[in-house]
Structures are given as structure tokens and as C-alpha cells.
Amino acid sequence: MSGKFVLEKGSSGKYHFNLLAGNGQVIATSQHYDSRESALHGIESVKTNAPGAKTDDRSDK
């Protein structure tokens, strides 16, 4: 099973999404968005930018 994005509307009325791994575990959570459309745009942005993203490991600093 592949991963998926789950879009939710919180009690505050704002939207956010989680990226779930194939096993259902949350591996990323977005910021909160004022509109559903903005949250969907955020999902598309992750889909577009993540495949070529490099890792900037700053854990030793």
C-alpha cells in the first residue's frame, strides 16, 4: 500500500494535512491553512517539490 495525504478541518475551522506512510503512520504534518483550497495547494506543492528534494543534515551543528 502506498502513502497518502489526508486533509482535515480542525475545530478552529482551519485546515491541515498529514502525509501517511503505507502502514498508516503519520510521517509529515502541514502548517494550518485558512482555506481548503490553500491546503490542497500545499499538498500539490509537496508532491511537486519533494521528489527532487535534497537532505540538509544539520544535526551535528
Task: Describe every region a protein language model picked out.
Residues 45-56:
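Short arginine-rich
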Residues 1-4, 51-53:
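Generic structural motif recognizing short loop/turn segments at the entrances and edges of beta-strands
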